[in-house]
Amino acid sequence: MKSRYLLFFLPLIVAKYTSAATMQPFHSPEESVNSQFYLPPPPGNDDPAFRYDKEAYFKGYAIKGSPRWKQAAEDADISVENIARIFSPVVGAKINPKDTPETWNMLQNLLKMGGYYATASAKKYYMRTRPFVLFNHSTCRPEDENTLRKDGSYPSGHTAYSTLLALVLSQARPERAQELARRGWEFGQSRVICGAHWQSDVDAGRYVGAVEFARLQTIPAFQKSLAKVREELNDKNNLLSKEERPELNY
């Protein structure tokens, strides 16, 4: 008898905790706004703006080994587990597949939309050389370097993602908007400190994230998911206590 009940309920249990992982993206890569069309070209070697890029790079390289450098290394990891760890205290609520499955799925979906789809056309078109390659330096996360060498630097996908994520989470938890905006900004700036991107890559990434945010507002599936995220992140059982949500230095 028990085995029959188990066979009946097991698919339902599995479905509950795997539905987030199998949910489809909100739109296809082809339906993204074409970043190669709307972004200006990255600064050339003779452009005065490139001097600013180099200054920003060396400013970041000068603090190698510092706590801020180590934060940049942590920010470089865009696995859903790490992003949840970083943004959970900022949003002031749990983010995990058990308690907040829709939010967990949203983190992964926004990475596809903002970090990959929205930046792809400009990255492929310009294939800009990354600063650590030009200067033959190491980044804050050496294990990523072989992949980064083959991926265009402009615009920054990490930055587009963090900008988009901060904006969407602010829709769900508007009372945490200033903290989310600040952490999203820091996350993008980490790419310059890490040596993976030029400042102009990060600046462009912020705009790409904002454009993708506007694109998602027109999609019913996103709005439906956002409503569930809002419900999860405002559930009293998922809110973090002051002890679990340390005060941020903002």
From Swiss-Prot:
Its EC number is 3.1.3.2. GO terms for molecular function: acid phosphatase activity. Its main location: periplasm. It comes from the Bacteria. Pfam families: PAP2. PROSITE patterns: ACID_PHOSPH_CL_A. InterPro entries: Acid_Pase_classA_bac, Acid_Pase_classA_bac_CS, P_Acid_Pase_2/haloperoxi_sf, P_Acid_Pase_2/haloperoxidase. Keywords: Hydrolase, Periplasm, Signal. It is an enzyme of class 3 (hydrolase). Residues 1-20 form the signal peptide. It catalyses: a phosphate monoester + H2O = an alcohol + phosphate. It is found in: Periplasm. One of its GO terms (cellular component) is outer membrane-bounded periplasmic space. Homodimer. Belongs to the class A bacterial acid phosphatase family. This is Non-specific acid phosphatase. The gene is phoN.
